[in-house]
Amino acid sequence: MTLDAARLTADLIRCASVTPADDGALDVLERVLSQAGFSCTRVDRGGICNLFARWGDKGHARSFGFNGHTDVVPVGDAAAWTVAPFGAEEKDGFLYGRGATDMKSGVAAFVAAAVDLVTTTPPEGAVIVTITGDEEGDALDGTKALLDYMAASGERMSVCLVGEPTCPDRMGEMIKIGRRGSMTAWFTVTGVQGHSAYPHRAKNPLPAMARLMDRLASHGLDQGTDHFDPSTLAVVTIDTGNTATNVIPAQCRGAVNIRFNDLHSGASLTGWMQGEADRVAEEFGVAVEMKVKISGESFLTPPGELSDLVAAAVEAETGVTPVLSTSGGTSDARFVKDHCPVVEFGLVGRTMHQVDERVEIAQIHQLKAIYGRILRDFFA
């Protein structure tokens, strides 16, 4: 059985699965996988649709896993598109539509490669496919739910490949072997409102906020590591909601976003920021409240057997030697890393989340070939 990955991508694009909606995307995959002999289970939780599929024996010591998502971001202004966002139109060698790059093509390429493998040369082992509809959203009931189901059901993956688009410009140029952690901290500084002509009768929260933001932003977190760039902290907002120039506001709010490497944890950075907030509160005689959300901790899959396997397949199919990287934002690999070794590889992500998102059709077939080689080499 040979499955056309580009056609499957088009079928998925026609599902308007704007997160958290599914619009039949997982039904498309379940039908294809079931016909190839995969045991499929819906792992829906919290209104989110998820699919777990396994070919082969449960708990097999040699189990290759794949993780991806079928939910997509909103299309924005549909009138700005030159094609229907969910029409899966082909034009000049490209397939257009929301999710074409991120990441319905990656899901389709792996499913097609896996179906070809198990129906033509069944391996000694198991192939596991985990697909969520909650990667672009809050990511609370997506891959987390799938991993919870696996733990409770005795399912396991020896290794996992996440099919996010990892290549910035050229097919095959980059494999992700880790990701930086991400966290956001919100600060509220409370003083005493007053007339700007009588500042001694007020307690202005703005100088305190400015001092706090300066202390945080001017502090070099680290110099990076062998596999990670230096951690970064960005001031993303400072706001009082005050439009009156003769009023000293009572409150000021600010926020920072930190992308951190494995020299830090969310807890260690929270402790550092709380210490800075306490010092500023004491210096200015104001109250400083901090709230934190840790979206994900940093992680690294050290270069070795898994990254070598993927890199060899990429080079064999593209002629490009991939760089092992930890750059970019977060992905669901941050959850998978607690289950098994994980790396990420997919196609060029230049148009993801953009108007007229599109994927080169030849790249879909090339990605299927890469995934197929990875699977064959893993089970060899």
Swiss-Prot record:
Coiled-coil stretches: none
InterPro entries: ArgE/DapE_CS, Bact_exopeptidase_dim_dom, DapE_proteobac, Peptidase_M20, Peptidase_M20_dimer, Peptidase_M20A
Protein name in UniProt: Succinyl-diaminopimelate desuccinylase
Organism: Ruegeria pomeroyi (strain ATCC 700808 / DSM 15171 / DSS-3)
Complexes and interactors: Homodimer.
Enzyme class: hydrolase
Catalytic activity as recorded in UniProt: N-succinyl-(2S,6S)-2,6-diaminopimelate + H2O = (2S,6S)-2,6-diaminopimelate + succinate
Function: Catalyzes the hydrolysis of N-succinyl-L,L-diaminopimelic acid (SDAP), forming succinate and LL-2,6-diaminopimelate (DAP), an intermediate involved in the bacterial biosynthesis of lysine and meso-diaminopimelic acid, an essential component of bacterial cell walls.
Pathway(s) where this gene product acts: Amino-acid biosynthesis; L-lysine biosynthesis via DAP pathway; LL-2,6-diaminopimelate from (S)-tetrahydrodipicolinate (succinylase route): step 3/3
Cofactor(s) needed by this chain: Zn(2+); Co(2+)
Binding site for Zn(2+) 2: 102, 136, 353
Alphabetically ordered keywords of this record: Amino-acid biosynthesis, Cobalt, Diaminopimelate biosynthesis, Hydrolase, Lysine biosynthesis, Metal-binding, Zinc
Family, as annotated: Belongs to the peptidase M20A family. DapE subfamily.
Active site: 71, 135
Cofactor binding note from Swiss-Prot or TrEMBL: Binds 2 Zn(2+) or Co(2+) ions per subunit.
PANTHER family cross-referenced by the UniProt entry: ACETYLORNITHINE DEACETYLASE, N-ACETYL-L-CITRULLINE DEACETYLASE
A GO term, aspect molecular function: cobalt ion binding
Entry EC number(s): 3.5.1.18
Gene: dapE
GO biological processes: diaminopimelate biosynthetic process; L-arginine biosynthetic process; lysine biosynthetic process via diaminopimelate
